[in-house]
Design a protein with these regions (language model features):
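Conserved active-site and cofactor/substrate-binding residues in soluble primary-metabolism enzymes
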Residues: 36, 50, 54, 70, ...
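Glycine-rich anion-binding loop/nest that anchors nucleotide
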Residues: 1, 87-93, 115, 120-143, ...
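Hydrophobic/aromatic ligand-binding patch that stacks against planar heteroaromatic rings
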Residues: 78, 122, 150
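Buried hydrophobic positions in well-ordered alpha/beta secondary-structure cores of metabolic enzymes
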Residues: 1-3, 75, 86, 147
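Active-site rim beta-loop-alpha module in soluble metabolic enzymes
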Residues: 83, 87-101, 105
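Short acidic, glycine/serine/threonine-rich loops at helix termini
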Residues: 9-15, 98-102, 143-146
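Ligand-binding beta-strand-loop-alpha-helix segment within the catalytic cores
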Residues: 8, 21-83, 87-88
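A glycine- and small-aliphatic-rich helix-loop capping segment at beta-alpha/alpha-beta transitions
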Residues: 14-24, 104-106
Length: 167
């Protein structure tokens, strides 16, 4: 996922839907300024940094801990329950949670870097498999290419695979 994915997943867990009409609030300076989403995501990231875990796991665990009413609809809570890694690749400044007072750039960087390392391990086992890029035509394809390079440079055979971009 990219950073927007965790924002939307958090909103779904909290209230059962995403919550903002961008067009209605962009001109007023309110875009991305919802207090609750920023506080929840940034607290989850800070805790994840303290625990040395990835951003996806950190948010999933935090949502479960808070027992939000729609956690059953959350990709991240489901991933934690099933012990399936969901990696989150953030570009600082691109997500609404980065403009909140609780945003901690060091924690964001630490947790998203943990996820990059996890993603590299996953890509190193991609031989004969498929990579589906969903929702990011710019950032995530670049992350994939870097992870593929890391895997190959570490001696993993990753030549026979299929990719598809859904954006």
């Amino acid at each position: 996922l990219n950073g927007a994915g965790i924002v939307h997943d958090t909103e779904v867990a909290m209230v059962g839907r995403t919550s903002e009409d961008v067009g209605a609030v962009l001109g007023t300076g309110e875009f991305g300024a919802a207090r609750e989403t920023g506080e929840v995501v940034n607290e989850a990231i800070s805790r994840g940094a303290e625990k040395n875990i990835g951003l996806g796991q950190a948010v999933g665990e935090y949502l479960l801990e808070k027992n939000f009413p729609y956690n059953d609809m959350s990709l991240l809570t489901s991933a934690v329950r099933l012990n399936v890694p969901v990696t989150v690749h953030v570009a600082v400044g691109t997500d609404i949670v980065h403009i909140h007072p609780s945003a901690d750039g060091a924690a964001i960087g630490k947790t998203t870097y943990q996820d990059f390392k996890i993603f590299c391990r996953i890509v190193s086992d991609l031989e004969g498999g498929a990579y589906l890029n969903i929702g990011s035509a710019v950032l995530l394809p670049e992350i994939f290419l870097k992870a593929l390079t890391v895997a190959r440079n570490l001696g993993h055979t990753v030549n026979n695979f299929t990719t598809a971009n859904f954006d």
